[in-house]
Design a protein with these regions (language model features):
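Conserved motor-coupling elements within RecA-like helicase/translocase cores
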Residues: 66, 107-125
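Conserved two-lobed SF2 helicase motor
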Residues: 1, 117-136
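Post-DEXD/H (motif II) to motif III coupling segment of the RecA-like Helicase ATP-binding lobe
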Residues: 4-61, 171
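Extended, charged helical/alpha-beta scaffold domains that provide interaction surfaces
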Residues: 249, 257-416
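Conserved segment of the helicase C-terminal RecA-like domain
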Residues: 25-39, 119-124, 137-201
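C-terminal helicase lobe
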Residues: 60-77, 161-251
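Conserved strand-helix element at the start of the C-terminal RecA-like helicase core
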Residues: 29-32, 38, 69-94, 98-102, ...
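Conserved helicase motor
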Residues: 58, 79-82, 100-112, 128-133
Length: 416
């Protein structure tokens, strides 16, 4: 299990804590993550063996820099899609373009954007805090365009470990890295800089937890078992999560309660409530979807009808539209991908798995193309890179008068 420090995350932490406490391999179980977890893991799992892998390169604070003065191979970090787009537009005009990384992108689109950056087609990466996990790139400098983020409740300053997770993307293996700020973020105070440069962060003393030994006798018993108190002081019961809120909403429907008349159907109700809200539009819309899915699974042949899924999927196959439209379609397709991968919800699950995968791939490719078209000026990028390398530019004039510089069209000669 990677990124085990996410046990302390308020939203997802209980999932990681459950794996820490209960997931075990046949021969070995390995948890990877920050050293801040060491004391509490030792307390929870006294027999655990710890192996440390120190960072080989140095991380140094480089202060504030204007966007136009950021070095090549920089990642610029903001915390909203609006800010990411605005920064990417500026970099496109000034430096020829940038790759874009956000949590809303599908893995296929994200990998294509990373490949664009890694290949040197662009020298800048604009990202949300999604850059902090699961991506290894040749980044020399990380610039924070903001030091605050919206966490679903309100705006707050980034915690030291959050800053460290992102700043640590700079440098790789034995190559040193730098971090700093840009735009209106302002400087990082000296105390915080010292923590980040020396990788000194407070230990995690409490982990988020939820009971996973659930009771399925009745829906009410299930809800009560979800709210069971934590067994230790260093485990903190999570506040309402999406799935438990969905359960409460569906339990308010008398027909749903009547259908959940046995432990098997209560378990099925809980499985439906666990469908993630990938689209994150309105909670009511997601709850209506869950309600409909459970009604299908609890009546008739107990399967989700193929024609119903087909109607929904047919609205998502279009690859036109702007960046947000394409990203929205991908998020909706993920819901159907999740449903199609449940073992006994569909008559022809394999068919729908292939269909949803094909649609997501097509939308992901279209989204990558849209991001590249909007945020990469290939002509400017090629010329800027050639000038930075201080080499002579290769220019040519074609037979019909087109002027090409480094293979890029720059104009046409007339009358010569």
């Amino acid at each position: 299990v990677d990124e085990i420090q996410l046990c302390a995350d308020p939203e997802r932490g209980h999932v990681f804590t459950d794996r820490l406490l209960h997931a075990r391999g046949e021969q070995e179980t390995m948890f990877l993550g920050a050293a801040t977890m060491k004391p509490i893991i030792r307390s929870l799992l006294p027999d655990a063996e710890f192996i440390e892998r120190p960072r080989f390169s140095n991380l140094t604070y480089a202060g504030e820099k204007k966007l136009s003065r950021l070095p090549r191979r920089s990642a610029i970090v903001a915390f909203s899609a609006k800010d990411v787009y605005a920064l990417a537009e500026l970099v496109r005009r000034q430096r020829g373009g940038a790759a874009v990384i956000m949590g809303a992108l599908s893995p296929r689109t994200r990998n294509a954007q990373v490949a664009l950056y890694q290949a040197g087609d662009v020298d800048y990466l604009i990202a949300t805090d999604a850059i902090g996990m699961g991506l290894n790139m040749d980044v020399d400098h990380v610039a924070f365009a903001d030091l605050r983020k919206f966490d679903g409740v309100g705006y707050r300053h980034l915690y030291p470990n959050e800053l460290g997770q992102i700043a640590g993307r700079a440098g790789r293996h034995i190559n040193d890295g730098t971090f700093g700020t840009t735009g209106a973020a302002g400087p990082i105070d000296a105390e915080m800089v010292e923590l980040l440069e020396n990788h000194r962060f407070a230990h995690n003393r409490r982990l988020h937890w939820r009971n996973s030994d659930l009771t399925f006798q009745t829906a009410s018993a299930l809800l009560a078992s979800l709210g069971r108190a934590a067994p230790r002081e260093d485990l903190s019961l999570i506040r309402d999560s999406d799935d438990s809120r969905a359960l409460q909403v569906l339990m308010a429907d008398g027909d749903i309660l009547d259908a959940a008349h046995s432990p098997a159907m209560v378990r099925r109700l809980w499985e439906v409530c666990c469908i993630p809200d990938f689209a994150k539009t309105l909670p009511e819309a997601h709850h209506r979807l869950l309600n409909r899915v459970f009604r299908f699974l609890s009546t008739g042949n107990g399967k989700v009808p193929a024609d119903w899924i087909g109607r929904h999927m047919s609205r998502l196959t279009r690859t036109d539209g702007d960046i947000d439209t394409l990203a929205g379609r991908i998020s909706h397709v993920r819901t159907w991908t999740y449903i199609s991968n449940q073992p006994d919800w569909l008559d022809d699950a394999r068919h729908w798995q292939e269909q949803t995968r094909a649609v997501e791939d097509a939308l992901s490719d279209a989204l990558h193309a849209a991001l590249t078209q909007r945020f990469v000026d290939r002509r400017t990028a090629v010329l800027y890179r050639s000038l930075k390398e201080r080499r002579d530019l290769l220019a040519a004039v074609t037979g019909d008068g087109e002027v090409l510089v480094e293979g890029q069209y720059v104009g046409r000669l007339q009358g010569l």
